[in-house]
């Protein structure tokens, strides 16, 4: 790592960038900052590998973004083993009819348990980012020259910049002067993994739109 540390007293060095959350957004941020001459740390409340409720679809722009960061990392992302390549999305509308969208860009489905851990391992092995797991953010204290990040285990760190990549229940967001989210912009997801599902089109993600749940939908992603 880069030699920064999270400790319990106030003598800790000021880290240039602390990313709260080590999912795809946080990991991509750390990868993008590699080589910028900054000290970087990621703090995540979980220990990797860890799961997230998601449809597990990894769309085309993901790979283009990684290519911009590093062609080598983009290649490794395409060659990732835990995947099901997808070429088509089929959408079923409320009257039962459907239409298909055939994608030119490369994409696949991958369980978040595996995908997120792959990205975190890229950060771990290819950058000097310090990774602190099992670190749940409690609060931020904004001082003149730094932000003090306080964690639930009573440890803390100082940062010149804090990036909130801590998801739907973001702690960082509470300290950003934006309008708070309302029920209008809130949604929930329920996911299960099923085996031996029959009558699936090859390399196809299926979306089912029902009148009572618009703009929500049901999905079957192989």
Which residues fall in each region the model found?
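Glycine-rich FAD pyrophosphate-binding loop
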Residues: 34-54
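A conserved beta-strand/loop capping segment in the N-terminal third of enzymes
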Residues: 62-63, 67-118
């Amino acid at each position: 790592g880069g030699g920064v540390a999270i400790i319990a007293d106030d003598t800790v060095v000021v880290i240039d960038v602390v990313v709260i959350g080590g999912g795809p957004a946080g990991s991509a941020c750390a990868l993008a900052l590699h080589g910028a001459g900054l000290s970087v740390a990621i703090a995540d409340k979980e220990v990797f590998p860890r799961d997230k409720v998601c449809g597990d679809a990894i769309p085309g722009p993901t790979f283009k973004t990684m290519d911009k960061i590093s062609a080598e990392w983009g290649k490794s992302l395409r060659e990732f083993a835990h995947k099901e390549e997808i070429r088509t999305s089929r959408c079923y509308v409320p009257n039962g009819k459907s239409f298909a969208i055939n994608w030119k860009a490369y994409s696949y489905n991958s369980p978040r348990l595996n995908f997120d851990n792959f990205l975190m391992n890229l950060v771990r092995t290819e950058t000097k980012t310090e990774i602190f797991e099992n670190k749940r953010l409690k609060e931020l204290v904004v001082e003149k020259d730094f932000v003090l990040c306080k964690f639930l285990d009573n440890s803390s760190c100082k940062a010149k910049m804090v990036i909130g990549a801590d998801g739907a229940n973001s702690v960082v967001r509470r300290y950003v002067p934006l309008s708070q989210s309302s029920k209008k912009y809130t949604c929930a997801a329920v996911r299960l993994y099923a085996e031996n599902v029959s009558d699936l089109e090859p390399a196809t993600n299926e979306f089912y739109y029902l009148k009572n749940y618009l703009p929500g939908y049901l999905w079957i992603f192989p």
